[in-house]
Amino acid sequence: MITIEQLLDILKKDHNFREVLDSDGYHYHYQGLSFERLSYDSRQVDGKTLFFAKGATFKADYLKEAITNGLQLYISEVDYELGIPVVLVTDIKKAMSLIAMAFYGNPQEKLKLLAFTGTKGKTTAAYFAYHMLKESYKPAMFSTMNTTLDGKTFFKSQLTTPESLDLFAMMAECVTNGMTHLIMEVSSQAYLVDRVYGLTFDVGVFLNISPDHIGPIEHPTFEDYFYHKRLLMENSRAVVINSGMDHFSFLADQVADQEHVFYGPLSDNQITTSQAFSFEAKGQLAGHYDIQLIGHFNQENAMAAGLACLRLGASLADIQKGIAKTRVPGRMEVLTMTNHAKVFVDYAHNGDSLEKLLSVVEEHQTGKLMLILGAPGNKGESRRADFGRVIHQHPNLTVILTADDPNFEDPEDISQEIASHIARPVEIISDREQAIQKAMSLCQEAKDAVIIAGKGADAYQIVKGQQVAYAGDLAIATHYL
């Protein structure tokens, strides 16, 4: 429960309070109301709900529906003049985060918080950290792929970083379940729209940066994207940073006065020997590590997670065991066809991650290589040119372009746009299952491989704003083995 007096105090301390308006006029103080629930969904309110009117597309009709259901007061940046009191604020998203934090009893203070950011690798690094910490603690995890609040039950996440009301409700449930640590993926969008406003992490990890999520409904420029990624560093007590990433020198200057540790080529924490399923490291994680996920970049993700978990209480033995146990749905999953050709299923969904995926496969498979690829509709339009650029740099690759969450766009138009950036013929088969079946039929020898990129473990396609059932890349590939 939270009282009107408590929430006004929170807003005033954050300099985010304008006034309370009701039929009697302007009020600096207000009293007599308390709330047992928080919501931003007008369909889920009653007389004991504190409602947040948020979003550029919010309509007064939503508020009228809530009032019909008994709503007594709402928080908003706008007075909709509907006859009930309104708490006016300058920034509704910041208000949501701080009020949710207090409403749920500040659960962030009862958990050790570990956050990963980066253009790619967040989910893999989070899984590594989860398995490391699980050896001696009770970690919860909020991940793009899966979320667990109790270490037993896993469910699919809707957002990389949940909305603040949901985030703190989930944190509170983690505390109730006896969890000791929370591992989170924190997207640039989470900072852009203040989902984690006011939250300080015990350790923040910056894995890498490359142009992505740049478009009309995401970040207008790379500078804006990079800036919002860096906010995790400002909001972490200690940081772990990849010294091999672009713009590392800037980040090193930024965190000079913070507790920090670097890994990668310009640091003391490096991978010295790398094999397909093992690596040796020097520095704070010195030793031998077995790993199920192939690729040097996955080994670096394991290093990043290990350095973070070391600070959070994990032992080197915990880290070694955790790395050896980690598998990630839809990340570098490998199948073998009856003719011994390989099928690789991976979530690679931007130019940089595609380049790394192709390089790893080419290192191990020297025959015919078939790539199945698409790009999502109505988001991340810059990826299409990036995909074309990467494919152009791999001339021995045979490419079939297909649907990958086309949303409100025509998947063939998206494929044609990708193809326009490739200086050789490619095939377009918009039906993703047919594309996979054809590619697999063309691989006949053990040295051949099919690479299915983009969707990973997703068992749906996003079409016209809706999730449409799709068997999933791994299930389809398994069917045609």
Curated annotation (Swiss-Prot):
Q: Which organism is it from?
A: Streptococcus pyogenes serotype M4 (strain MGAS10750)
Checking Gene3D superfamilies in the record gives: Mur ligase, C-terminal domain, Mur-like, catalytic domain, MurE/MurF, N-terminal domain
User: Any idea which positions bind ATP?
Assistant: 118-124
GO MF term list = ATP binding; magnesium ion binding; UDP-N-acetylmuramoyl-L-alanyl-D-glutamate-L-lysine ligase activity
What pathway, per the record?
A: Cell wall biogenesis; peptidoglycan biosynthesis
Protein task: Catalyzes the addition of L-lysine to the nucleotide precursor UDP-N-acetylmuramoyl-L-alanyl-D-glutamate (UMAG) in the biosynthesis of bacterial cell-wall peptidoglycan.
Concerning Pfam families, the annotation shows: Mur_ligase_C, Mur_ligase_M
Report what the Swiss-Prot or TrEMBL entry states about this protein's PTMs.
Carboxylation is probably crucial for Mg(2+) binding and, consequently, for the gamma-phosphate positioning of ATP.
Location relative to the cell:
Cytoplasm
PANTHER family xref list: MUR LIGASE FAMILY MEMBER, UDP-N-ACETYLMURAMOYL-L-ALANYL-D-GLUTAMATE--2,6-DIAMINOPIMELATE LIGASE MURE HOMOLOG, CHLOROPLASTIC
**Upper lineage:** Bacteria, Bacillati, Bacillota, Bacilli, Lactobacillales
Q: What protein name does the entry list?
A: UDP-N-acetylmuramoyl-L-alanyl-D-glutamate--L-lysine ligase
Q: Answer yes or no on keyword ATP-binding.
A: yes
Write out the entry's keywords from A to Z.
ATP-binding, Cell cycle, Cell division, Cell shape, Cell wall biogenesis/degradation, Cytoplasm, Ligase, Nucleotide-binding, Peptidoglycan synthesis
Q: Residue ranges for motif L-lysine recognition motif?
A: 404-407
